[in-house]
Amino acid sequence: MNKEQKSRLENLLEKVANVLDYKICSVNLQTNQNPIVIKIIIKKTNGDDISLDDCALFNTPASEEIENSNLLKCSYVLEISSQGVSDELTSERDFKTFKGFPVNVELNQKNSKIKFLNGLLYEKSKDYLAINIKGKIKKIPFNEVLKISLCTLKD
């Protein structure tokens, strides 16, 4: 499948997603498989979680649109899934959901020897991130934070 065909396929799938209030996160074609595999990752436009029923709901009209478009002249398998849980915390919802969970905070302090801090997610405000490091609360200004990721803590 060439770039133009893939672009047409993505546009077609976007139309189906828009009708159902979903957003296409990615479309991955595995043309080395027989039949080829089309992996589509979707999310809801309102930020709610994607369920198995949502994937099934998207599958039928997506399959029909692909068939009606005659873009693919061969058999294919359509796989619909959600984004899943990312290790990186980015949204307000992530910070509420994972409060108390172990996190790794990557710092952008160029002159400091400390590049990472590990602790339990305690609080997030608009100005700082607070983590619990062995019972002590450490407030880190957001301008010093590069990335916040879930991790596992070892004693």
UniProtKB/Swiss-Prot annotation:
Annotated keywords: Cytoplasm, Ribosome biogenesis
GO BP of this protein: ribosomal small subunit assembly; translation
Gene Ontology CC annotations of this record: cytosol
Domain of life: Bacteria
Subcellular location: Cytoplasm
Keyword Cytoplasm: yes
Disulfide bonds: none
Record NCBIfam families: PRK14646.1 (NF011240)
PANTHER family: RIBOSOME MATURATION FACTOR RIMP (PTHR33867:SF1)
Similarity comment text for this entry: Belongs to the RimP family.
HAMAP family tied to this protein: RimP (MF_01077)
Function statement: Required for maturation of 30S ribosomal subunits.
Protein name, entry field: Ribosome maturation factor RimP
